[in-house]
Structures are given as C-alpha cells and as structure tokens.
C-alpha cells in the first residue's frame, strides 16, 4: 500500500505542475500575460481540488504507517487492496463537490474595474481583490473550507503519529 500511495502522490504532483506550469511558461515566453475568466476559474478549481486531495492522501498515508507500525500482524487484513483503493479514491473525489461549489461561488461575484491580477496563477486572494461587491461571506466560506480540509487531516495525522510514538 505504501508504494501505491507514493504513486498517487507522484500523480498528484504531475497534476499540480500540469495545472499551473503550462500557462506560466506561455506567459513568460510570449510576454502576453492574459487568461480568460473561464480558464482562470478552471485553473483555480483544479488547484483547490488537488490541494484537498493532497491533504486527504497525507492523512491516509499516516493511517497506513500507523497500521504498519502499531499492528503489523493485522496490517495485511486491515489495509488490503480493496480498502487501500477505497481510501485513495475517497481522497481523490472527496473534495471535488466542495471545491467546485467554492469556485462557482467565487466566480459568481460581480467583477468591475480592473481585471488584472498580480499573481503567477489564478488564486483566491487576487480574485477577491478584483470583485467590486462585498466578499466577506465568500472569504468566511473559504476560510471555513480551508480549516476543515487542512485541520481535519492534520489532526488525523497528529493522532496517527502520536499513537506511533
């Protein structure tokens, strides 16, 4: 299972790089730093989904290591192929609906005035700066989702490694 999880981390990093690097290299090569609103939304959505996947995969990996170290005799039974696949698939699809909804909420804001972002890729704070309406509710929702998607896996990792020590 460990190598399967590491393979998923490798795929995740390839996806991260494929999401941001082509546009960045094109912009640097052509000196034309433009991106459509739809492309910006797609890029942001992919970055958010991949970030959620990374957090979940880290928690799954911590659980895998906990089981391997603390219950080595039960490890093959608990972390069998089916369970490993389910945990990884859950990690990959767990954040999709939330992050798509969050991206839709952010890009539903009214935009007026300048349409320039001073950033290498489409990220949430620069997009909020472009919005001309009240972004408070959206910002609170972003922070709530960020806390949930980062803190819950972090606490699971902490508990797993705490039990190992």
Outline where the language-model segments fall.
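Transmembrane helical core of 7TM receptor-like proteins
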Residues: 1-165
């Amino acid at each position: 299972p460990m190598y399967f999880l590491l393979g998923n981390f490798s795929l995740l990093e390839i996806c991260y790089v494929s999401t941001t690097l082509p546009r960045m290299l094109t912009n640097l090569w052509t000196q034309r730093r433009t991106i459509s609103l739809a492309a910006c939304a797609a890029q942001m959505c992919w970055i958010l989904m991949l970030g959620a996947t990374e957090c979940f995969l880290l928690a799954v990996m911590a659980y895998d290591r906990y089981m391997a170290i603390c219950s080595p005799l039960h490890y093959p039974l608990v972390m069998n192929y089916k369970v490993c696949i389910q945990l990884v698939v859950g990690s990959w699809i767990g954040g999709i609906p939330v992050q798509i909804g969050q991206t839709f909420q952010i890009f539903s804001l009214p935009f007026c005035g300048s349409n320039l972002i001073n950033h290498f890729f489409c990220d949430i704070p620069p997009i909020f700066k472009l919005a001309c309406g009240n972004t408070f509710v959206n910002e609170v929702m972003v922070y709530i989702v960020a806390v949930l998607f980062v803190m819950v896996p972090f606490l699971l990792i902490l508990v797993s490694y705490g039990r190992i020590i």
